[in-house]
Design a protein with these regions (language model features):
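Sec-dependent bacterial lipoprotein signal peptides
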Residues: 1-10, 15-45
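Acidic/polar, low-complexity intrinsically disordered N-terminal segments immediately downstream
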Residues: 47-128, 285-288, 292-330
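Auxiliary, metal-adjacent structural segments of Zn-dependent hydrolase domains
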Residues: 110-165
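Surface-exposed patches in mature extracellular/periplasmic domains of secreted proteins
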Residues: 124-141, 203-204, 208, 272-280, ...
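Short pre-active-site segment immediately N-terminal to the catalytic Zn-binding motif
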Residues: 172-191
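Post-HEXXH active-site segment of zinc metalloproteases
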Residues: 204-227
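Metalloprotease/metallohydrolase-associated module, dominated by Zn2+-dependent proteases
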Residues: 221-292, 321-326
Length: 330
């Protein structure tokens, strides 16, 4: 049968070819291994023929860092007690490249470092103890001399990154000879308390009922303006009060609203707070009070911090700034 013969032939000739192919593969594998071994030997030989490795020098600087008196002061007052890296020399890698920035002046950095320690850090230490601050304080402070402006024209006062780092801008605007408490609060301390409160609520969240008080009124990134028949108008704090917000920025979102209550309360007098509530009107004041009750209870019950006591300490320390030598490093 021709067909069966063809099948036999096909079956006969195909099988030996498969065995032969397998053998070829084995041979090729061995040849490849020998080639790689030979290549490795050549490379190692070439390396041995190169100049000896210079172990006496490193591509990394091993020279001791030269510290000035301010650096030593920062070690004693920030680094050793709290493990804080206080960066007053602007580092490009630590800066936000979308802004045009300049470094902080040395004298301004010295003054602000003393003010921050006395008014902000030591206030929490006085009330809650040094261990509390050691655990929760951001480990990096970065000072920038110039303001940071968004494309919208808004000036960024400060930023925080994951509870690890706080950047303060516009340091060069600090007038050491004429201390302005309101300006210090606006530029620095409202920001410091604001960002620190973020760290705390990210560790232990606040009552979610807070989010529902002004639900539907948050405007996100549009917090800085509102629309009228004449067009967009800047939204100032007093514009936000009747809507139940302590600042215009509090209208961004609930988390910002929460921490703005803390920042504004502890940095301002009761007279300021009462005037704000009156200007807010009955509805606005009721909303602010409802929110602040949650804020106050959270700080007291969760962290053992009475905001009334913290405010007394902060306001007292603000008045003591004029008694501090802001220029001399001892």
């Amino acid at each position: 049968n021709p067909n069966s013969a063809e099948c036999d032939r096909g079956g006969y000739t195909t099988q030996p070819e498969k065995k032969l192919t397998k053998k070829k593969v084995e041979v090729m594998k061995k040849q490849l291994i020998y080639f790689l071994l030979a290549l490795t030997a050549v490379c190692l030989g070439a390396c041995n023929n190169d100049d000896e490795i210079d172990t006496a020098h490193s591509i990394f600087s091993t020279e001791p860092v030269e510290r000035n008196a301010f650096d030593d002061w920062l070690l004693d007052n920030y680094t050793y007690p709290y493990n804080i890296d206080f960066m007053y020399r602007m580092k490009d890698i630590e800066s936000d490249h979308k802004y045009n920035l300049v470094p902080a002046d040395y004298d301004k950095a010295v003054a602000l470092s003393k003010i921050i320690k006395h008014v902000w850090m030591d206030a929490y230490v006085e009330l809650a103890g040094i261990d509390f601050l050691r655990v929760y304080v951001p480990k990096t402070f970065h000072l920038i001399g110039s303001p940071a402006y968004e494309s919208s024209g808004n000036m960024v006062l400060g930023t925080a990154e994951g509870g690890k780092k706080i950047t303060l801008y516009n340091v060069n605007d600090l007038n050491v000879k004429k201390i302005n408490i309101e300006k210090l609060n606006n530029y620095y301390f409202e920001t410091m308390h604001h960002e620190f409160a973020h760290i705390l609520h990210q560790k232990r969240n606040f009552d979610p009922s807070f989010n529902r008080i002004s639900e539907g009124k948050y405007v996100g990134a549009d917090w800085y303006y509102y629309m009228t028949a004449e067009g967009a108008m800047p939204r100032t704090n007093d514009i936000a009060w009747p809507d139940g917000f302590v600042t215009a920025y509090a209208m961004n979102q609930a988390n910002e609203d929460f921490v703005e209550n803390i920042a504004m309360y502890v940095t301002h007098t009761q007279t300021y707070w009462d005037n704000m509530l009156r200007a807010a009107g009955e509805t606005g004041a009721a909303t602010i009070n409802k929110k602040f009750t949650i804020v106050y209870n959270y700080m007291r019950d969760t962290w053992g911090i009475d905001l009334n006591e913290l405010r007394k300490i902060v306001l007292r320390r603000q008045q003591e700034i004029t008694e501090i030598d802001l220029s001399t490093i001892q």
